Amino acid sequence: MLNKIYDTQKEGCEKAIASLKRDFTTLRTGKVNINILDNVMVDYYGSPTPLNQVATVLTSDASTIAITPWEKSMIKAISSAIQAANIGVNPNSDGESVKLFFPPMTVEQRQENAKHAKAMGEKAKVSIRNVRKDANDEVKKLEKDKAITEDESKKGQDEVQKITDTYTAKIDTLVKEKEAELLKI
């Protein structure tokens, strides 16, 4: 009974960490990462479509992303979608492809991104605390329904807290690593 609650809690915590890692890919570091374009949606014949489903996206060097659409007619739509995504660069088109040139990041930009990383980490911790609350509520409900004793309930809540502490520490580590990566020149 309690093991099922622990497993559900761990699953919820893993989802929070996966979400945090996904959020981190949107932060720009010193070198270009094509994941910064993951949330760019292109108008493809009237329906919003992820950029990577209408074009090949590659990094050509440490500061440039090259986007080659599968249909040349999509260049204008891709450029518009990138501008609308507000990722901090203007697309340059040569008629065949779209290139994104990322200027070197300033110290202020790096510090701002580090703040964003910390805020993302806090959001993930809130998610984990919500998962902990749900798990504790389930343990207390079992005790109230006389399915477990008061001692088992206390042990169960202690285990829920240990799981929470473990995942909170993982988030702290991920945030510290991301901050170090962002602030590294």
From Swiss-Prot:
A Pfam family: RRF
Keywords (A to Z) from UniProt: Cytoplasm, Protein biosynthesis
GO terms, molecular function: ribosomal large subunit binding
Subcellular location: Cytoplasm
One Gene Ontology cellular component: cytosol
Gene Ontology biological-process annotations: cytoplasmic translational termination
Signal peptide (residue range): none
Main subcellular localisation: cytoplasm
HAMAP family: RRF
Family to which this protein belongs: Belongs to the RRF family.
The protein's role, per its UniProt record: Responsible for the release of ribosomes from messenger RNA at the termination of protein biosynthesis. May increase the efficiency of translation by recycling ribosomes from one round of translation to another.
Name of protein: Ribosome-recycling factor
Record organism: Campylobacter concisus (strain 13826)
